Amino acid sequence: MKEKVIDFGNEKVSILFKKLFFPTLLGMLSMSAVTTIDGIFVGHGVGSDGIAAVNICVPLLMSLMGAGLMMGAGCSVIASIYLSKGKTVLARATITQAMLFVTLISVTVGGFILAFPEETARMLGSSEHLLPLVVDYLVWFSPSLLFELWIAVALFAMRLDGAPKLAMWCSIIAAAVNVVLDWLFIFPLGWGVMGAAFATSLSCLAGAAVAMGYLLFYARDTRLHSLRPGRKKILFFFHDIGMQCKIGSSALLGELTMAILLFIGNQVFMRHLGDDGVGAFGVSCYYLPFVFMIGNAIAQSAQPIISYNFGTGSTERVRSALRVSVFAALVCGVISTAAFILFPELLVGLFLRIDNTAARIAIEGFPYYGTGFIFFILNLSIIGYYQSMEQVKPAITFAVLRGLVFLVPCFMALPAIMGVKGIWLALPLSEILTTLVIVVTFWIYSRQRAIICR
């Protein structure tokens, strides 16, 4: 299971990025495919009500995935710097602590959902009509939370250990298992949204088994090991977890941005267009994680290169990694935007019959919605750059701008001004405004450096 050692300190940055990016991208897209496959089968097996029900659950699930990405990004940055200084034991301890922490989070939240499913569904904004479907999905999906968070952290550690291809296969295996089980549970067995949720839980278990097997028995530098109890060890644990949360918080905010988008979007669409509007928005939101994962794959591929060379003081290699990641973000953003503008019928048709009311609403909105994807992916790559260098303040600032400061007002104001079209344009405008702030920040910083160097 071992792969060739990756030399983060000497190999050409563009070649390093390619080695990491393509396996990471395929793996991340496979992770998104797990939920999207649910949507395709639910859309054709249950209908737009099923998609709306799953979409109501997604903000909570994204928030928890954000916690996993936060811990994965945070522990990976710290472990990268430890490894650049030859401190392998501390790197392993950091990753083990992250795994333990996400285990506690997932068990706590999963237990709450199982104890109070209807209350959780209503808290997420479910209508009485959709409540039985939402409860079914929540109850049967909650066991997967543990495995999803394990995978989220493990993939960071595996890429850092020089095993990006195996990390990719963990996600692909989970997606493949999900396809088979979704078909079996929804169509032959007729289990509906419950079947989709149960299929996701089992598929995540399969992916987590591969990832944890690697970290327990095969990893070179990021292998899990036992943590000794004791007062000082416990204090060190909480201190280290705090640092990981601080460094990775922008990754959490990235997922929370999507969770906020879904939560507020569900409410706004429900108010303007009812359950059909939520179903239409739900189709678009099945694609949003793919766009997010593209940006995330760029940031995660650049992260070990940036963090390692930042730890060794190789400034030019850090800048080179930034240039490569920005170029990749622009290319991927243009392709994503073009797909939504040119092929809305094809994209919507994967989930719903084109003559469906929800489908018609989605087809009209997709071209507006897709205009923001260039800026969406670019913003994620820049936030990842700052996060990789432990520059928490700008990373969090940009993440908060796109997730709260700009997005929420856009959702409130644009529908009042432009009607339904304004709901679709809320995300693009929020991302464009964030990009403008980032560009101005870079310009000011460049001028300050030029003045200092004179």
Language-model regions, residue ranges each:
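Short alpha-helical transmembrane segments in multi-pass integral membrane proteins
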Residues: 1-24, 79-146, 190-249, 306-372, ...
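Interfacial helix-capping/hinge residues at the ends of transmembrane alpha-helices
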Residues: 39, 76-77, 118, 155, ...
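Helix-terminus/linker motif at the lipid-water interface of multi-pass membrane proteins
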Residues: 33-51, 121-128, 184-191, 252, ...
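Alpha-helical transmembrane segments of multi-pass membrane transport proteins
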Residues: 15, 30-31, 68-69, 109, ...
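Structural signal for membrane-spanning alpha-helices in multi-pass inner-membrane proteins
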Residues: 113, 156, 182, 186, ...
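Short runs within selected transmembrane alpha-helices of multi-pass transporters and secretion channels
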Residues: 72, 141-159, 167-178, 196-212, ...
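Small-residue-rich hydrophobic transmembrane alpha-helices
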Residues: 51-111, 148-167, 280-342, 376-395
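Transmembrane helical elements of multi-pass membrane transporters/channels
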Residues: 19-38, 140, 174, 203-207, ...
